Amino acid sequence: MKYLLPTAATGLLLLAAQPAVAANTGGYATTDGGETSGAVKKTARSLQEIVDIIEAAKVDSKGKKVKGGAYPLIITYNGNEDSLIKAAEKNICGQWSKDARGVQIKEFTKGITILGTNGSSANFGVWIVNSSDVVVRNMRFGYMPGGAQDGDAIRVDNSPNVWIDHNEIFAKNFECKGTPDNDTTFESAVDIKKGSTNVTVSYNYIHGIKKVGLSGASNTDTGRNLTYHHNIYRDVNSRLPLQRGGLVHAYNNLYDGITGSGFNVRQKGIALIESNWFENALNPVTARNDSSNFGTWELRNNNVTKPADFSKYNITWGRPSTPHVNADDWKNTGKFPSISYKYSPVSAQCVKDKLANYAGVSKNLAVLTAANCK
């Protein structure tokens, strides 16, 4: 396998771009990801090296296991798995039955950041379980294997205070025969569930994904606060997210090419959908596949402001036979509560015009501000 090693300048630029305390995530997360005094910095070229570094951080200098981790970690990943990604792209329907590959961050609360270098890539996921204060940035995840084993790109289970920022996650928005719903392709891009809360998902480029992400694993897993901002979603089918209860604040995202449904607000969840750009989208805001506990939404300052805009932006609606509510009148159905963090959204037009310069990998963690919209 060929590894692409970063230059010293590239590594320094990425580290300089990450603030000493990354508490302002633009959302509910306030994590510093271990970027504190006493943090240990390591470099890894492979999935196994990341795993080994994390396991070593769970014991002290005497070899005694320390609950929550012995010290904060900052792991720079510079491996390259483009060959695995390209092979998977040629055998899309064969990925489902393969073994899932992933780094599991389990029961680690001391603080950890995984930071990809420019040019790195991964055919494995990052699975955060019973942990907190975790940051994943500048990672390029492609064509995850092991859909039958829940092989998500990023999974957050029972883990508060997580920041998923400036990553690229991609596969093929495609259906393979093999199950009753022909769903044997890939698992989710970002699933947040099992009591996880105070999570920010920002500046990611997510494309070619059939099931983008869950907010909640079941109808009883409903209590969470999530923020999605400055993400680009292209050629995706559904779950943007599939929201089971809780609060979702989504602002300054670009949705282009939704082939199934977008926001699916269920189980009395509340969504604030603010200053986003929608185009070429089927059912961009809806509540469906639920019994009767439909969620509500507040629509604020998006490019679509009224039904007359639907044809302009190619917004269309489907009406399933089961109970549902569509935002096909583009009116608010609820009121979002006060927001606990500071944020400064740009206009939806600026999102359309400029966000591609900032979202995804190899952008040196740059952010879009009003000054960039001029």
UniProtKB/Swiss-Prot annotation:
Q: How is the cofactor bound?
A: Binds 1 Ca(2+) ion per subunit.
Q: What keywords tag this UniProt record?
A: Calcium, Disulfide bond, Lyase, Metal-binding, Secreted, Signal
Query: Where does the signal peptide begin and end?
Result: 1-22
Give the binding site residues for Ca(2+). Answer: 150, 152, 187, 191
EC number(s) on file: 4.2.2.2
Instruction: Please cite one Gene Ontology biological process associated with this protein.
Output: pectin catabolic process
GO molecular function (one): pectate lyase activity
- InterPro entries, per database record: Pec_lyase, Pectin_lyas_fold, Pectin_lyase_fold/virulence, PEL
Compartments, record wording: Secreted
Entry annotated with the keyword Membrane = no
Root EC class:
lyase
User: What is its pathway?
Assistant: Glycan metabolism; pectin degradation; 2-dehydro-3-deoxy-D-gluconate from pectin: step 2/5
SUPFAM superfamilies in the record, alphabetically?
Pectin lyase-like
Disulfide pairs? 93-176, 350-373
| Catalytic machinery residues | 239
**What protein name is recorded for this chain?**
Pectate lyase 2
Q: Which gene encodes it?
A: pel2
